[in-house]
Amino acid sequence: MASPAAASVRPPRPKKEPQTLVIPKNAAEEQKLKLERLMKNPDKAVPIPEKMNEWAPRAPPEFVRDVMGSSAGAGSGEFHVYRHLRRREYQRQDYMDAMAEKQKLDAEFQKRLEKNKIAAEEQTAKRRKKRQKLKEKKLLAKKMKLEQKKQKEEPSQCQEQHASSSDEASETEEEEEEPSVVIMGR
């Protein structure tokens, strides 16, 4: 047996920090706990699961010898061989049907995806055009405002032009106006 002195020579084991028990209430908390555990020891390799291969049936045999019918007359073992071959063939056909259906659904999904993408692009183009139109309108209004400021800065030239044009405009307005008579009741 080991002496008590030999046991005391060994250094004491480092104590682990007590961890509080945390029960995640939702998926976000569970993910947070997993991330915290991973980040405690960043040197440790992270286990990344590989994608599981889909099950596929065994390829059919290239050559089947002495195929008997389903009757057991040829021998008691022949029926079991036939039954297993038939089961595998049915499995293979079901698998091929399922794969064809899956490919069909995938193709339909891709078509819908393309259709939605085109519709979204059309909508985006329409909105982009509208934004551009508004932007141009604002720029045009800004230019008009700047032109008006410039005209106000040069009042002598502008006032003469406005005076002559306003006289002509008032004369045409007077000629165009007809007396309006409103007769109320009898």
From Swiss-Prot:
Q: Which domain of life is it from?
A: Eukaryota
Starting at the broadest rank, the lineage of the source organism is: Eukaryota, Metazoa, Chordata, Craniata, Vertebrata
Which residues lie in coiled coils? 91-178
The gene that this protein is the product of is Prkrip1
Q: What is this protein called?
A: PRKR-interacting protein 1
Tissue expression, per UniProt? Broadly expressed, with highest levels in liver, kidney, brain and heart.
Record's GO cellular component terms: nucleolus; spliceosomal complex
Q: Where is the composition biased (Basic residues)?
A: 126-143
Q: Does the keyword Protein transport apply?
A: no
Give the span(s) annotated as Disordered: 116-186
Indicate the quaternary assembly. Answer: Component of the pre-catalytic and post-catalytic spliceosome complexes. Interacts with EIF2AK2.
Q: Name one GO biological process term.
A: renal system process
The cellular location(s) given in this protein's UniProt record come to: Nucleus; Nucleus, Nucleolus
Main function: Required for pre-mRNA splicing as component of the spliceosome. Binds double-stranded RNA. Inhibits EIF2AK2 kinase activity.
